[in-house]
């Protein structure tokens, strides 16, 4: 029986073609929860006016069809208009409308059933992968991979776009004059003229962080300039003197105008580090602005193009290491398209910020770019001799622990870093029950084993893992001291701070100039994540001359937020009276442990009966509080403060 559904009322001009019926579509298309979501996104009244078809049956494009929405890989492969020599996947084409030879607009998105499923139930292999992409600087400029958990969000956005195009049509693209390899005098004059405008800026670089080309456009102009810096033969495009004048003019333009970039933290860092261009005071980063609107959604330039613009996907056209003049021209054209799309996205984002009420939040994020980039460039000084000594000591300790493990397990070839060997030893040879089959050898699983089984080898394995992790975290390239004129004084830790790194707006950090492509040094980069350094590692930080190091932290920040999201009760009273929630929970959950270690055990019961205000005033509270906090350094099975902390976190996150 055919599953296609024709409109029952006046046709709105929108045809939807599913790649294949879902496992629930036995009698009609879009059944079950996926069908409910689709109807909700499109609106029940509109569903009656569309043509709904499936690619596994003969498809009929009705007269007066304006838009065809292709849902699923099969529909895209069969019907999406492909440009010659540019194979297109669903991930690349999603949300980017294309005009077919029949004059109909084609746009594609995820199949509703795939978007509704938390994993791939439709394929025989049933892949569990969420499809999360890495958050490195190379992915934020491309379309990137879309996380499966966000497929519903993007499907909804694409459905709205398809219906809008069916109703209003696709407006002609704004016409820009993209000047590739322009006259350098014209470029310099153009940069020095504007004041108080938006300067749309994008750079392309090699794996060594040297410029390949610079693209820019001013908000009052339709001229887009793509200025080549180096040719594919690694020679300057212009003379040394003209290149200096261009950098000077670019510096002036960035100081006089508001710089708009996508992922400005990378572009501005390269310009400051390699070409000594001061960090501009006024910056608007479209990636940060989008992140403040929708924190959990992908933020690559390709994703934003699919949301705001009606342009074909071009992010696969970039050639970052051209080897001939043709590839070089392709890179320059790609850079020009990035400038044009960044400008269109920036205009759309202004309205989106108002719609979501995130203007102040985005303004704060943009204002933080300059100080965090300054922190990246300065780095944190370290005692290099102490740094090297600590690394050597950690490696020596790890090797000594591994020798002890080899002796105690009677396995000279025991490799603690091999989860297969550790799994075989613990669960096959020692016949221990595995608390977590999915993660049989991670630290939490081994700690759970220790609470029930007093096996010395587990303690040694944990110590070896921890020591190895600490030593591995020190396998970094130290950053140059840019405050001196010396070019070989590499004595500083550094990191790239990622303001858009987390869904909760918490600051992220990572190594800088770290590439998957390039030489061995390029794959290491400089620095490391400085957000979660162990106390032992932080002792290696030293202050610069005339300065002092300080530590600023909002203790228990997440618990504090939860306390104020809830109604006013005892949980909030803990913070109002300066009592850590971890201490309070530990006091009640492990009171028998405190009784064994205190001179006056009866006071523990008395403390448990008090409310937060009374607890703070009790004469014995300080003594018990200190004991609870000290338990964090006790043996693994007795780290009661740590366990109480985990209980609090689990409660706060509704686990």
Residue ranges and their predicted role:
Residues 1-166:
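A polyanion-binding, active-site-adjacent surface
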Residues 18-19, 71, 110, 201, ...:
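Active-site flanking residues adjacent to catalytic metal/cofactor-binding acidic residues
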Residues 66-73, 200, 257-267, 549-551:
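Acidic beta-strand-to-loop metal/phosphate-binding motif
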Residues 78-79, 267-273, 425, 561:
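Phosphate- and divalent-cation-binding pockets in alpha/beta enzyme and binding domains
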Residues 104-107, 113-116, 122-146, 153-156, ...:
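Active-site-proximal helix-loop-helix substrate-binding element of RNase H-like nuclease domains
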Residues 161-235, 296, 308-309, 313-316, ...:
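Conserved "right-hand" nucleotidyltransferase catalytic core of DNA-directed polymerases
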Residues 565-566:
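Detector for conserved single-position "signature" residues within domains
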Residues 641-653:
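Short, amphipathic alpha-helical "recognition" segments used to contact nucleic acids or chromatin
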